[in-house]
Amino acid sequence: MTDEGRPKTPAAITTECSLIVEQHLNVEFYRESRAKFLSTCDDYALMMLVSKDHGNKFWFSIWEHQIDWFENQNIPNQYFTLACGGSDLMFLFPVALFQSWKEDLSSRIYPKNGRKYWHINIKQVSGIWNLQTKKEFDDISLEEFQIGEK
């Protein structure tokens, strides 16, 4: 169980998802930790986050320490992958793009450790998968980042 009392995603699911990303990028990864993958060619870093299906909505958190991990890598191609309920629906996007979205997203400081995290809420609206932003901003379409077929 995590600190919040929720069970962790089984490692087999993140591995299955990483294999699909390998095919999509035509690169081979090895696992550095439960969610972190590096390519054997040293050109790619990948963070694999998995959400349960919450009725056609998916929730994630991206933490400051996860961004710090990317910043400490001397690797040109850095990606987040958001796996929505498993490997059938995933969104793959560059970390640099997430950096440009951060101000539009809700964030919080976790009181137990003082770390900042961003709320990542994905919802399908009128057939389009969107990253939901704060009310004063337009939601971000994730269609161009979709891999998988849900």
Enumerate the language-model features and the residues they cover.
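Exposed alpha-helical structural elements
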Residues: K8, A12, E16, I20, ...
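Glycine-centered tight beta-turn/hairpin loop motif at sheet-sheet or coil-to-beta transitions
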Residues: C41-D43, G86-S87
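A broadly conserved detector of short glycine/acidic/proline-rich loop/turn motifs that flank catalytic sites
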Residues: V50-K52, K135
